[in-house]
Design a protein with these regions (language model features):
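Well-ordered beta-strand positions in beta-sheet-rich domains
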Residues: 7-9, 62-64, 91-93, 162-164, ...
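Glycine-rich portal/gate segments that line the openings of hydrophobic small-molecule binding cavities
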Residues: 38-82, 193-240
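Ordered, small/hydrophobic-rich secondary-structure cores
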Residues: 2-11, 15-127
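Hydrophobic ligand-binding cavity/cleft-lining segments
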Residues: 1-38, 42, 139-142, 148-193
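Short amphipathic alpha-helical signal-transduction/dimerization elements
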Residues: 137-145, 286-294
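Short alpha-helical interdomain "coupling" segment at the junction between an upstream regulatory sensor module
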Residues: 144-152, 293-300
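Beta-strand/loop substructures that line and gate deep hydrophobic ligand-binding cavities in soluble
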Residues: 5, 79-134, 221-224, 234-283
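Hydrophobic pocket/interface hotspot
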Residues: 19, 29, 47-49, 67, ...
Length: 300
């Protein structure tokens, strides 16, 4: 098999020293990246991390990562046997540079490279590694901001996203925000299209670039609709890969007095990494739905 290189750049709202510590302090690393860690911060020292949040490394005895290069607070490189095969190490190199634009406060430009001499022997290896780092970076951003972290669980045979929020408004107002195009455009959509019946069109009007291709992302169709109670839509592959099976997103509304409990369920995913950074994305949109509905309810 051919080699695989995955590169990424992330701007983080923290100084390089703070970000470096998040990777190299055991207590911090286990707060956002892995369940357990055993770190020897020297070249050639152990950089072990393991647990159900680490692919192919559920136990300490299966963790063989090592520090390759270390220069605080700007460089960390470590080996990472990711394929579960002896002798097939991948290598992660992270560089941290202070963002010269100080108008937004202390920030770090994190550049990463994950190199495999041979691509992992799995389906869609590039997508797998990309999603692995989308999960990690989303959790790192949340950790640095004091927000909620959503660690993956590689022991889960049926991975899914489940989020919930309580909105200070009755169900019919929340339901309106899910089915009215003008309302959707205020909190989640760009140019929403809604045919409010089963098998009707349902689009957020999203358009973005993935590896040089333009993708019309988000839902395309209503699968189920129950007035003021439930909305279920399809959710095609976000990278625009038509060969991948679509998932579905369910919005379930429950009346709790004068309030509404909204539960979002996104499923099914074929593998844990396919969940990607959806937990953070859906938490963001649920917060947007709450803010939109409560502000419009107050104004009316």
């Amino acid at each position: 098999m051919t080699e695989l290189n995955h590169e990424f750049t992330e701007t983080l709202n923290a100084a390089p020293e703070r970000v470096f510590a998040a990777f190299t302090d055991e207590a911090q690393l286990t707060s956002w990246f892995a369940q357990s860690a055993d770190l020897e911060l020297r070249e050639g020292g152990a950089f072990r991390f393991w647990g159900r949040s680490t692919w192919q490394t559920p136990f300490r005895w299966s963790a063989h990562q090592k520090v390759l290069r270390l220069q605080a607070p700007g460089l960390l490189a470590f080996s990472w046997p990711l394929d579960g095969l002896d002798g097939l190490d991948s290598e992660v190199t992270l560089t941290l540079v202070k963002d010269e634009d100080e108008s937004a406060g202390a920030r770090t430009v994190l550049k990463g490279r994950h190199h495999f001499p041979q691509a992992p022997s799995i389906d869609r290896p590039l997508d797998f590694v990309d999603d692995l780092w989308r999960i990690a970076l989303a959790n790192l951003r949340a950790y640095l901001a004091g927000g909620e972290v959503y660690p993956p669980d590689f022991s889960d045979a049926a991975p899914r996203v489940r989020q919930a929020v309580t909105i200070d408004a009755p169900r019919h107002k929340v339901f309106h925000a899910l089915l009215n195009p003008d309302a959707l455009n205020l909190w989640i959509a760009a140019k929403a299209v809604v045919e409010p019946h089963q098998e009707g069109r349902y689009s957020y009007g999203w358009s973005y670039d993935v590896r040089g291709r333009t993708v019309a992302g988000g839902p395309t169709q209503i699968l189920e609709v129950v007035e003021n109670t439930k909305l279920v839509t399809d959710w095609p592959d976000w990278r625009g890969d038509a060969s991948r099976p679509a998932t579905r997103v369910s919005w379930v509304l429950e009346a709790i007095g004068d309030q509404t409990r909204v539960t979002l369920i996104h499923e099914p995913f074929e593998r844990t990494t396919d969940v990607s950074d959806y937990p953070h994305g859906w938490a963001h949109f649920l917060a947007g739905l709450k803010q939109h509905v409560e502000s419009t309810s107050t104004s009316t």
